[in-house]
Amino acid sequence: MPESQAKPGGNATSAIMLLALASFAAQAMVRVTDSLLPQIAADLNVTVGATSVIVTFYLLAHGSVQLVIGPIGDRFGKYLCVAIAAASAAVMVALCGLAPSLPLLVAARLGSGFATGWIIPFAFAFIGDVIPYERRQQVLGRFLSGQILGQLFGQAAGGVLGDWFGWRNVFFILAAALATATLGLIYELWRNPITHAGHASAQPGRGFIADYSTVLRSSWARTVIVISFIESSVMFGAFTYVGADLHLRFGVGFTLVGLFVGSFAIGGLIYSLSVRVLVNRFGQTGIATGGGALLALAYVTLACEPSYWIAPAAILTIGLGFYMLHNTLQTNATQMTPEARGTAVAIFSSALYLGQTAGVAAGGVIFDRFTAVPLFLAAAAVLLALGLWFARAIKRRHAQMA
């Protein structure tokens, strides 16, 4: 698939490694308070239910800001925007650790959500600017390891470190990671010419509305965005309730549930480490189809499992299958509209968060009325069909571009 412009000189590896560090901290911030809520509630002398607003407000800020930031990255440069966002996030995350009351913690979490929401979409868009399309899925797959480790840190290590050192120090650790990434990003901006790729100075001037129109007029962009919304809503509308199902159906303790659910990240890391082999062997269509098939197999297993000891293998398979399908979507999102790449990836990322929000809400209603079994079976059917649909869409797209 042709690129819109020649790739600039410079060292892409060092630039992307620092983006991975910033993405690690950004992804960790999404999930870190899940395991810290009881400690925060006790320390601030409020209920866990009241404290949960720090999760809601963060996700609201993190997802909504992505709807409007795209043209800014296209205009001023994605790498520069990530550096500024990481610096702002470092300050806001440190303020989370210093907050003496729940209202101030909510305000700091809201601010950190607005800041970190810039990092991952622009990191993906920057990789789209500097890595040729034929190599992009492999690079994005390896880049994903930073996000996956961040998710694992947020879900598991956050609670462990909170027990050992206190919840405030967990935020200070993440603030230090963001500050370190900021210094590295600024250094790269100063010395590495590749960090200025995709800057608007090399593109014709357009307004914000024109950037969004460019993306939404593209039938391929609309296809990728719709599929990503469905994928996110169905995937997380079911996966969110895996732990609750294990506890209610089999009586699995919460500690074991946490360990079981953590195997999702291990499946993601397996994909990240094997992405080169998978791309070379199966191509995008094979990976998308295989990802959907693995997701279907795993969710059917969870629905029909006779013993909870089967769950870790099924959840690991969900992690592998999800990242196979999702990373193929991400790769195509970076090439939907190269002339407005930042805007395109920001819309794509926002669709993921909106889909996740809708899916979790709908899944909760179904879970309360009918248990998780119909959720898992529906997810299996839809995700299998989605993988096949996307693989067929990729084939048509490549035929049109040939």
Which residues make up each language-model segment?
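Helix-loop-helix hairpin linking two adjacent transmembrane segments in secondary transporters
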Residues: 104, 133, 142-190
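Helix-breaking motifs and short loop linkers at transmembrane-helix boundaries and internal kinks
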Residues: 45, 77, 98-104, 115, ...
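Helix-to-loop junctions at the C-terminal end of transmembrane segments
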Residues: 65-77, 270-283, 367-368
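Cytoplasmic helix-loop-helix junction between adjacent transmembrane helices
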Residues: 108-149
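Juxtamembrane intracellular "pre-TM" segments in multi-pass secondary transporters
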Residues: 2-10, 190-225
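Paired small-residue
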Residues: 92, 103-111, 309-317
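C-terminal transmembrane helical hairpin of 12-TM major facilitator-type secondary transporters
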Residues: 285-329
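Conserved MFS/SLC helix-loop-helix module at the cytosolic interface between two early adjacent transmembrane helices
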Residues: 64-100
